[in-house]
Amino acid sequence: PGGELAEECRRAFLLSCFTGLRLSDLKTLTWGDIERAPEPMIVKRQSKTKDVVRIPLAPTAWELIDDRELHHRDELVFPRMTASKGVNVHIPLNTWRKKAGIDRAFGWHAARHSFAMMTLEASGDIYSVSRLLGHSDIRITEVYLRLLDSRKKEIIASLPELKDEQKTFEFKQPKQA
């Protein structure tokens, strides 16, 4: 049973990395929240905001939940995570963190944070990322932009310096015909 919970938590955490879903929404995610056609997509009323989010599923995200079985619309996608009040979904996370040699503790929200950072970095489209996350105000999403700005500084600082012979350029005028 513990191994099954850990595997379910692994799939849920990774799904959050690819969808930005909160833990509360992962726990209440039903098969009825997932549209399979024309493209796999999660259409979910968020627990926190009560707003509906529509999140297209990347192939990697779809593979995490597609078990190729038929499910009732009301059936939970991750039933072990909500089986009882005593289920601690943070234990598997800490176990993985320690096995990976990561000293700094993190929680489930790190997956949502990772999604926000990856999608913003890849697209630069703060409006769409804000909608995917279900933020009620774009200013909430702007917090991630500030983090990306510091990341940009790191990237620029890591660029190699030009050698002296590379610093001068010789421009020639095109010949007149």
For each predicted feature, which ranges?
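Basic, Lys/Arg- and aromatic-enriched nucleic-acid-binding interface segment
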Residues: 1-23, 27, 48, 71-72, ...
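Exposed loop/turn and edge beta-strand positions of beta-sandwich/beta-sheet ligand-binding modules
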Residues: 9, 38, 51, 72, ...
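C-terminal catalytic core of tyrosine-transesterase DNA break-rejoin enzymes
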Residues: 11-14, 18-25, 112-136, 143
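Conserved tyrosine-mediated DNA breakage-rejoining catalytic core shared by Y-recombinases
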Residues: 19, 24, 28-67
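The DNA-recognition helices of helix-turn-helix-type DNA-binding domains
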Residues: 33, 114, 123, 136, ...
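Catalytic-site neighborhood detector that most strongly recognizes the C-terminal catalytic loop/helix
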Residues: 44-50, 133-158
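C-terminal catalytic core of Y-nucleophile DNA break-rejoin enzymes
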Residues: 47-66, 74-95, 107
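C-terminal secondary-structure termini that scaffold catalytic or DNA-interacting sites
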Residues: 67, 80-81, 157-177
